[in-house]
């Protein structure tokens, strides 16, 4: 099978709050904004924010789907998660630094950064 995964969406209760959170986190403006579904396009991948309650859907928040964002360095990772509620602290796992935070809407999001050879990063 030849396939490609091109998008994922997170359920949000408050679109304005969620858009502000992710604009700050990604350091870029939302690509498409709507009261029900807003989109960030990052490296060709579409991350959607879905205001599920506006269309009468139900949803359970938590860690059943874990988007993972890769950044270039542990310094960037630390800067991006500073002040956020961590549900998994910064930890070295094999060749990566990994942390997981809870976003403004209750979703869990992982952030990873590569460990540099001889970098003494801790």
Model-found features: residue ranges?
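Residues that act as N-cap/strand-start positions at coil-to-secondary-structure junctions
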Residues: 32-34, 63, 93
């Amino acid at each position: 099978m030849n396939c490609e995964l091109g998008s994922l969406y997170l359920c949000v209760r408050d679109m304005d709050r969620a858009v502000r959170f992710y604009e700050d986190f990604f350091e870029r403006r939302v690509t498409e904004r709507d009261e029900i579904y807003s989109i960030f396009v990052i490296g060709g991948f579409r991350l959607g924010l879905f205001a599920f309650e506006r269309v009468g859907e139900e949803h359970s928040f938590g860690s059943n789907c874990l988007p993972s964002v890769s950044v270039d360095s542990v310094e960037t990772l630390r800067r991006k998660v500073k002040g956020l509620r961590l549900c998994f602290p910064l930890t070295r796992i094999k060749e990566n630094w990994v942390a997981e935070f809870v976003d403004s809407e209750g979703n869990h999001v992982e952030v990873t950064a590569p460990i540099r050879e001889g970098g003494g990063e801790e």
